[in-house]
Amino acid sequence: MDMIDKLIAYEEGMLDGAGMVYLFAELVRNGMAWSLQGHYGRMASRLIDTGILTKDGDIDEMRAIEYGIEM
């Protein structure tokens, strides 16, 4: 699935929690989280603030599980 398909799936609510985390990890890594509409940057910031993602886009799966996201 290419990035556009992933974004459409996210917008349509078709991604589960893990899919959303993986999408935002990719958006942080490639910098798109900060150039798309504001929601994406805010969500990426929340995931970073909670420790689920690092500022480099790495995923802390144990932290995600603590927040109820099945990885």
Enumerate the predicted regions with their spans.
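Catalytic phosphate/metal-binding cores of nucleic-acid and nucleotide-processing enzymes, i.e., regions
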Residues: 1-71
